[in-house]
Amino acid sequence: MRCYIMYKYMKEAWKNPDESYVKELMRERLPKWRRQPVIIRIDKPTRIDRARRLGYKAKTGYVVARIRVRRGSRRKSRFKNGRDPKRMGVNKISGEKSIQRMAEERVARKYPNLEVLNSYWVWEDGKAKYYEVILVDPQCPSIQHDNKINWICSKKHTRRAFRGLTSAGKKGRGLNKKGKGAEKVR
């Protein structure tokens, strides 16, 4: 019971990080994170409450990786050929994929033997966004014998980050909304 109360307060603190202890905590951690590699495997999640809500368990077979991704909309090169600057189509163009989905795909490429379960936002500064990605090892016996997660071991869940089967992928493909009115989302 005590853990659930703790998670409740952690959730509230992360909802408004500027008004809670989270801002000071990140001010200490961010200089270290900037010097570390872009993708780094970490021992335990920074936001344990969020990770557990998304399916993380502290046992063998589960891995958490933190990734740094650039901020902002799509980087599009300027045309060399002549045209009206208005028709160049350089500014205000966003990509099809969200930055979170890009983060999941990059981590999946780094760890090809693991499957992406889910991911969540951790922090952002002027240049980058930081996400933590929860990965699962489908070959691990503790995962294969756990009825709550062994669905990820089947072949139809291979490379799920690249096929948009994670939560961020489904959101970007417009699959969160159903029924009347959702026609233009997809």
UniProtKB/Swiss-Prot annotation:
Pfam families listed in its UniProt record: Ribosomal_L15e (PF00827)
Basic residues bias spans: 170-179
SMART domains to which the protein is assigned, alphabetical: Ribosomal_L15e
GO biological process, alphabetically ordered: cytoplasmic translation
PROSITE patterns (alphabetical): RIBOSOMAL_L15E (PS01194)
Keywords, comma-separated and alphabetical: Ribonucleoprotein, Ribosomal protein
HAMAP family: Ribosomal_eL15
Protein name as it appears in the record: Large ribosomal subunit protein eL15
Organism: Methanosphaera stadtmanae (strain ATCC 43021 / DSM 3091 / JCM 11832 / MCB-3)
